[in-house]
């Protein structure tokens, strides 16, 4: 649902894809199906507001089931689950009387995104988020590569200079979309506080990784010449991470916007309102810093 999970939220996302491939509900067939269950009393008005939220983030609708006192279901999807499979679904999802379970079906990445958004919205609107708590977690095993949904080309997911898990052998033998990177984040209450990686220090790995992403060695030399040349002399294995001190202070002060704890923050359009930047520069100023503007 998110690569920055807020563990103060007790709701969890359930994968029910395989189950719904055996049902007769056509909108779910051939799609990834995620679900979020919650035990709470929700009015008709609450459901309407949640549906409005769902359509506002791009969902076509928001299917759900309620578990009644006799352990039967109530909801728009009930009739599409065969009677002989209803007990199986209750066990699969861990449902109890009084639970409501919401469904998100789409391509895998979109279904995950929608599930994360619905989980957060339910947690906030039903006041389920734990108060006065800091819940930390490490997030790791990020994918090294991803496929662009528009161009269909493979590119780097995050940092192209990270070490792939499995090294050169993985790059030579595995499906690029199955390769993981040695990358990691520290997250607290849904905020990324620190991000880092084991950096690649091997020339062959760097050349092969960029080749998979569509860059030959000549492009690598031209775009990252300094690093390419440095690798000719060898580099030690190294790793690290960069802490976001401003984000830590934001959490401690319970601020929603990071600009509230930065002395002279830029606006949402990247303007420095105190200094009036960016602004026009003179030809003399450009010469002083050896910048030439070409039309």
Where are these regions (language model features)?
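Structured aminoacyl-transfer and RNA-binding surfaces used for tRNA recognition/handling
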Residues: 1-295
């Amino acid at each position: 649902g998110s690569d920055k999970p807020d563990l103060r939220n007790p709701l969890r996302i359930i994968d029910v894809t395989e189950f719904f491939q055996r049902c007769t509900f056509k909108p779910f067939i051939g799609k990834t199906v995620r679900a979020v269950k919650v035990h709470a009393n929700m009015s008709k008005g609450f459901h309407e507001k949640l549906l409005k939220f769902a359509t506002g983030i791009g969902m076509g609708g928001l299917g759900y089931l309620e578990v009644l006192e006799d352990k039967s279901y109530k909801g728009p999807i009930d009739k599409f689950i065969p009677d002989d499979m209803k007990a199986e679904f209750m066990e699969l999802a861990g449902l109890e009387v009084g639970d409501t379970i919401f469904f998100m079906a789409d391509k895998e990445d979109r279904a995950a995104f929608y599930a994360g958004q619905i989980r957060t919205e339910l947690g906030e609107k039903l006041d389920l988020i734990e108060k006065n708590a800091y819940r930390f977690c490490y997030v790791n095993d990020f994918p090294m590569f991803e496929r662009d949904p528009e161009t269909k080309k493979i590119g780097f997911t995050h940092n192209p200079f990270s070490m792939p898990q499995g090294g050169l052998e993985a790059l030579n033998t595995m499906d690029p979309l199955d390769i993981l990177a040695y990358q990691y984040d520290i997250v607290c209450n849904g905020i990324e506080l620190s991000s880092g990686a084991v950096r690649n220090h091997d020339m062959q790995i760097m050349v092969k990784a960029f080749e998979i992403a569509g860059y030959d060695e000549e492009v690598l030399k031209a775009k990252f010449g300094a690093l390419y040349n440095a690798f000719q002399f060898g580099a030690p294995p190294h790793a690290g991470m960069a802490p976001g001190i401003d984000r830590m202070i934001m959490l401690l002060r319970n601020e929603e916007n990071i600009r509230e704890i930065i002395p002279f923050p830029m606006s949402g359009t990247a303007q420095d309102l105190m200094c009036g930047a960016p602004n026009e520069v003179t030809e003399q100023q450009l010469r002083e810093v050896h910048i030439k503007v070409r039309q």
